[in-house]
Amino acid sequence: MAKILLEMKNITKTFPGVKALDNVNLQVEEGEIHALVGENGAGKSTLIKAILGEIPHTGTIEFKDTKDGHMAKLKIGYVPQSVNIEKNTPVSVYDLIASYQYNYPVFLPKSKKIEAKIRETLEVFEAEELIDKQVCNLSGGQLQRVLLSMAIMDEPNLLLLDEPVSGIDQNGMELFYKTMDYLKTHYDLAIILISHDLDYVAKYADHVVLLDKTVAKQGTVKEVFESKEFERIFYTGEESWVREEEHK
């Protein structure tokens, strides 16, 4: 039986004039990919920010451990939806990761030990050839692979991904989801993934949470994708009729 890593109770967040989250209750288990799906404005990114402690909210978020009910040291890896990189910043991928991860000054010569560790992590996402490239010259897909590598370097307990495959081509998406499947299995990692790629969610997610400011439906892919709540949010009018015809 999977172990609960994170439990959210009655999470509510209101911005001026807008309720972004309304009594969200959710449990996240180790070794599973939890996909957050829903329309734009459903509160998915807001929920990620609440978990990260970036925004105040009501309700409780509790990180748990198997021994005493609480984690001695929680490590969270996070990849945002987008990152702004100054075009004139002459920093290589090695410099970026070494300075961020190891506080290693960019003006010092390369450390062979640090370089080996960085290269090893980049290899997980088939990005080792990017180690000497200037960050400002990376494509969107290349940058996302570098950010994903940075997110897992500390071997986190929890990995938060806010639409991490935006800007990545089809081959890159397939590699990403296969890598997530590998990480959750080999590191017993809990992954919370925001995604609009429903085909990939159906293929790789262990647990799906349909968010509509509150949890409209959660469960297995089958339970959520075949629910009336999913139908209401994602299929209306002619699209709904087409879907009904497909299932006859």
Question: What is each PLM-predicted segment?
Answer:
Residues Q134-L138:
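Conserved ABC ATPase signature
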Residues S195-H196:
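H-loop/switch region of ABC-family ATPase nucleotide-binding domains
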Residues K112-L130:
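Conserved ABC ATPase "signature" region
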Residues V209, K213-E223:
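Conserved switch/coupling elements of ABC/ABC-like ATPase nucleotide-binding domains
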Residues L159-E163:
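Catalytic Walker B motif of ABC-type/P-loop ATPase nucleotide-binding domains
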Residues K222, E226-K228, R232-K248:
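ABC ATPase nucleotide-binding domains
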Residues V37-E39:
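The feature captures the beta-strand-to-loop junction immediately N-terminal to the Walker
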